[in-house]
Amino acid sequence: MGCCTGRCSLVCLCALQLLSALERQIFDFLGFQWAPILGNFLHIIVVILGLFGTIQYRPRYIMVYTVWTALWVTWNVFIICFYLEVGGLSKDTDLMTFNISVHRSWWREHGPGCVRRVLPPSAHGMMDDYTYVSVTGCVVDFQYLEVIHSAVQILLSLVGFVYACYVISISMEEEDTCRNK
């Protein structure tokens, strides 16, 4: 019964990671953030693989999940550095959209308490079809919301890493005892 608690905890944690990743995926789609969309998609696939491995007693699948959590933590640390503009990174670049559009984080204009005001294009027509959007009154700036999302992902991944290592070690011990009999 003691072995089940680690597995059950990992299943619950994977479910939380799926919910968190799906929520993040939705808002990244709304903001046309293509790099995070791709990362979230891969994350969802690997978490499902880890969930399957945990339920079906497949330690190799859990190992893939464990390696992915390390990569996922690295990606989320990069996102935190990007939005906090650490090390020469700038949140105003088109890096998250692969330089194919001028879209930014959905939270930039739709954060909690934000009042969005669309201004008409300039008289010179320099802005073509783009209109300037003025955003005021945000309770929390968008970059901090993105940092919070990444911090939650890091926390869930680190706890998932620990539980995955525990479940793998329990699975390996069970295999060793079965081989010795």
Curated annotation (Swiss-Prot):
Per UniProt, subcellular location reads as: Cell membrane
Q: Which UniProt keywords apply?
A: Cell membrane, Membrane, Transmembrane, Transmembrane helix
Disulfide linkages recorded for this protein, renumbered to the chain, are: none
Q: In which tissues is it expressed?
A: Detected in the brain only and specifically in neurons. Expressed in multiple regions such as cerebral cortex, thalamus, hippocampus, olfactory bulb and brainstem as well as in cerebellum with low expression in granular cell layer.
Q: What Gene Ontology cellular-component terms does the record carry?
A: membrane; plasma membrane
* InterPro entries per record: Na/K-Atpase_Interacting (IPR008516)
Which residue windows are transmembrane per the record?
Answer: 2-22, 35-55, 62-82, 152-172
Sequence similarity: Belongs to the NKAIN family.
Q: What is this protein called?
A: Sodium/potassium-transporting ATPase subunit beta-1-interacting protein 3
Organism of origin: Mus musculus (Mouse)
